[in-house]
Amino acid sequence: MMRAVWEALAALAAVACLVGAVRGGPGLSMFAGQAAQPDPCSDENGHPRRCIPDFVNAAFGKDVRVSSTCGRPPARYCVVSERGEERLRSCHLCNASDPKKAHPPAFLTDLNNPHNLTCWQSENYLQFPHNVTLTLSLGKKFEVTYVSLQFCSPRPESMAIYKSMDYGRTWVPFQFYSTQCRKMYNRPHRAPITKQNEQEAVCTDSHTDMRPLSGGLIAFSTLDGRPSAHDFDNSPVLQDWVTATDIRVAFSRLHTFGDENEDDSELARDSYFYAVSDLQVGGRCKCNGHAARCVRDRDDSLVCDCRHNTAGPECDRCKPFHYDRPWQRATAREANECVACNCNLHARRCRFNMELYKLSGRKSGGVCLNCRHNTAGRHCHYCKEGYYRDMGKPITHRKACKACDCHPVGAAGKTCNQTTGQCPCKDGVTGITCNRCAKGYQQSRSPIAPCIKIPVAPPTTAASSVEEPEDCDSYCKASKGKLKINMKKYCKKDYAVQIHILKADKAGDWWKFTVNIISVYKQGTSRIRRGDQSLWIRSRDIACKCPKIKPLKKYLLLGNAEDSPDQSGIVADKSSLVIQWRDTWARRLRKFQQREKKGKCKKA
């Protein structure tokens, strides 16, 4: 009898140790209490800090699903007591239809009054290999500190505690109790717990004695003996280990006196059953340090009241638009709050990029999506193409970017300088939007060269007045009538340009023409640019009108690359093709240009 008393005291001491650990014992830092504060998730300066929900008995008042309950149909059961060496049995009736004689599962999680014990009770003699299970759904993820059961019957000889992290879809062992660990659960007896296996269930024979015959306690501490418990904040393994959505207790084997097979075995078997007065699951609503309480949502589901810009049932992700750094669990040192993306008020959505986060020294990884108000960039921090910054407004202003409004004819593109708004103008065009001709230029009818240089009067010794030599017929044949331009002629020449003859000067055996190159349709190896340039033609070619050129006229010139006298400009000779320009040729020459890029000239 004294032994039973001492065991009961030891069991109560174990529960007291658990409660003491919950209140601040070493290795259970995640369950440390906090002093009352106006806002437990912020310090006195308003800075975020870790906050955790209150410690509760998560089983209290919840329904427990059991695989066996006495009373359907009504059945006799006998309670064994001992007086010295004598065993006494007092028999009663379990009747589920009579509230005074029923032992329903609700008694497992009701208010436990030691002066008026209420006990759930199984059917009689459900012995191994049959088992009896108690399944408790917590309603959401909890970080469990302990699971305890107080018995009205003798404690089981073998029992297992399981947990689920996915609302009962899968189960993993939490703890085993048995005098025959290897036989019952294929586990070694009291295996040492190391850092390598601290997330695994162990089997022990503690709390498996048959006595006391009533009032015995089994209490399992989830972190007791786990090596990383002292550094719980930095141990994802143990954080996962204590997490559960459901708890299941499986009673595998009854303790007996060995009289179940004797002559009065029916009376003996009616004395063996499982009966529990109290099932407790001590722990906290799992909120990863980002909430101080759990509340019911619109669907009446239990969820964390998330802070620190977090979201989710367990505050296990960042809320929308707060992806500038990755989600992390809060610790005693760092709140690890989620940070909003910096989009300068021009975007409503963003995403996280780990590569950018690493490159920033782990400070910022947010990338803004769908920038509005004509902005662009990772942070919507510059103006998109076709717009420029209005420096009189902050970048966060809705009208911080102004349209370039580049002239459709005078500008060479739609993109302007991001700072000044200056559009890229074509040759001879000026103005911030390229809307007027520059000094010394006049407007033309060509959309390609809308501004051309104002012509200069030809010199007194004009190229057209040169006397024709007598041997021109044998030297070259001047073109007569209309010349046609085709792909074959285009491919044979090194360059093809549209020119405007401005003036001509005699330079020894050469004529130097100052021309304005309006368009370049082919340039070969020589880099020919639009604008003013020199055209060199030998005097004899000009005298024989090969080619025939007049000042102030526009021509299509197709020629071959040749060094000019001053190493600049282009050279034409009797083999060059010079045709007075027609605006209808522009489209044809652009087609030739495209075909050349596709390699058609090689086949021509």
From Swiss-Prot:
Residues 285-340, 341-403, 404-453 form the Laminin EGF-like domain. One of its GO terms (cellular component) is nucleoplasm. It comes from the Eukaryota. A motif (Cell attachment site) lies at residues 530-532. Changing C601R: In MRMV4; likely pathogenic; changed localization; exclusively detected in the cytoplasm. Keywords: Apoptosis, Cytoplasm, Disease variant, Disulfide bond, Glycoprotein, Laminin EGF-like domain, Repeat, Secreted, Signal. InterPro entries: Galactose-bd-like_sf (IPR008979), Laminin/Netrin_ECM (IPR050440), Laminin_N (IPR008211), LE_dom (IPR002049), LMN_ATRN_NET-like_EGF (IPR056863), Netrin_domain (IPR001134), Netrin_module_non-TIMP (IPR018933), TIMP-like_OB-fold (IPR008993). Residues 47-284 form the Laminin N-terminal domain. It is found in: Secreted; Cytoplasm. Changing K489E: In a neuroblastoma sample. Transmembrane segments: none annotated. Widely expressed in normal adult tissues with highest levels in heart, small intestine, colon, liver and prostate. Reduced expression in brain tumors and neuroblastomas. Expressed in epididymis (at protein level). One of its GO terms (molecular function) is RNA polymerase II cis-regulatory region sequence-specific DNA binding. Residues 472-601 form the NTR domain. Glycans are attached at N95, N116, N131, N417. It holds the Pfam family EGF_laminin. Its main location: secreted. Residues 1-24 form the signal peptide. PANTHER family: NETRIN-1 (PTHR10574:SF378), NETRIN/LAMININ-RELATED (PTHR10574). It is linked to Mirror movements 4: A disorder characterized by contralateral involuntary movements that mirror voluntary ones. While mirror movements are occasionally found in young children, persistence beyond the age of 10 is abnormal. Mirror movements occur more commonly in the upper extremities. MRMV4 inheritance is autosomal dominant. Binds to its receptors; DCC, UNC5A, UNC5B, UNC5C and probably UNC5D. Binds to its receptor; DSCAM. Interacts with DCC. Interacts with APP. Netrins control guidance of CNS commissural axons and peripheral motor axons. Its association with either DCC or some UNC5 receptors will lead to axon attraction or repulsion, respectively. Binding to UNC5C might cause dissociation of UNC5C from polymerized TUBB3 in microtubules and thereby lead to increased microtubule dynamics and axon repulsion. Involved in dorsal root ganglion axon projection towards the spinal cord. It also serves as a survival factor via its association with its receptors which prevent the initiation of apoptosis. Involved in tumorigenesis by regulating apoptosis. This is Netrin-1.
